[in-house]
Amino acid sequence: NSAHPCCDPVTCKPKRGEHCISGPCCENCKFLTAGTVCLPAWGDFDNDLCTGISSDCPRNPWHKS
């Protein structure tokens, strides 16, 4: 059983000095830079962009539900 390289096996949280474990805005245990496209534009809607402070990809408020 191999542990995730970003995860502290005791706490199941990111290791000291790391930002994240996984997510569309997480790469190599770090948050992607603000403005990085995490969901490309489609139709008449703009790209969804990483914030630089979260591993989540925030939804563009102009996307259809």
Swiss-Prot record:
Expressed by the venom gland. Residues 1-65 form the Disintegrin domain. GO terms for cellular component: extracellular region. Disulfide bonds join C6-C29, C20-C26, C25-C50, C38-C57. It is found in: Secreted. It holds the Pfam family Disintegrin. Keywords: Cell adhesion, Cell adhesion impairing toxin, Disulfide bond, Secreted, Toxin. SUPFAM superfamilies: Blood coagulation inhibitor (disintegrin). InterPro entries: Disintegrin_dom, Disintegrin_dom_sf. SMART domains: DISIN. One of its GO terms (biological process) is cell adhesion. GO terms for molecular function: toxin activity. Gene3D superfamilies: Disintegrin domain. A motif (Cell attachment site) lies at residues 42-44. Belongs to the disintegrin family. Dimeric disintegrin subfamily. PANTHER family: ADAM A DISINTEGRIN AND METALLOPROTEASE DOMAIN (PTHR11905), ADAM METALLOPROTEASE (PTHR11905:SF159). Heterodimer with CC8A; disulfide-linked. Inhibits integrins alpha-IIb/beta-3 (ITGA2B/ITGB3), alpha-V/beta-3 (ITGAV/ITGB3), and alpha-5/beta-1 (ITGA5/ITGB1). This is Disintegrin CC8B.
